[in-house]
Amino acid sequence: MRVLPAVLCALALCAACSEPPQKEIDRAQGALDAAKAAGADQYAPEAYTAATSALQQAHDAVAQRDYRLALSRAVDANERALEAAREAANGAARARSEAEAALPPAEASLQQLRTKLRAAEAARVPSIQLASARRTAANAQRALQEARKGIGAGRYLAASAALKDLPARIGVEMKAIDQAIAARGTRRRR
């Protein structure tokens, strides 16, 4: 009597693995598609790649008629895709926060640069010495517009990239303007 349940379980397992686990593969593909829609390829690339790899291994196992391995890989791909979607949500929130936090310092730096440009013009610094600072101000304005547009469209990494090192670049130009104003002032005194 004890042998009969064991034989029935073995037969059930063999029957379950005699066909490709299409339902599980489809579920994993759906989870992978949802993870991509959530931005997992950008915000959780390692988890997304692992899920994609596991799903490919499931397809490879089906091609080799190893349905037990295919089932295992499909379930693994589904779990990894769900994890990638969770990580993507966290990554997107973190990227949004970083992009939004980078806006005020960049805007303040641009405003300071514009103020320095006006002061340099009032001090009659030659226009050619201010050309680089004016280009930087125009580029900074474009970068800020791109960043705002990126944040509005949910492209947080692009927004952060647009603002990367912007205050530092503006700082270099402000220092050059200060030097030009100081040089202009010492020439006047002579």
Write out the residue ranges for each language-model feature.
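Sec-dependent bacterial lipoprotein signal peptides
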Residues: 1-15
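Long, charged/polar, soluble alpha-helical segments
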Residues: 17-190
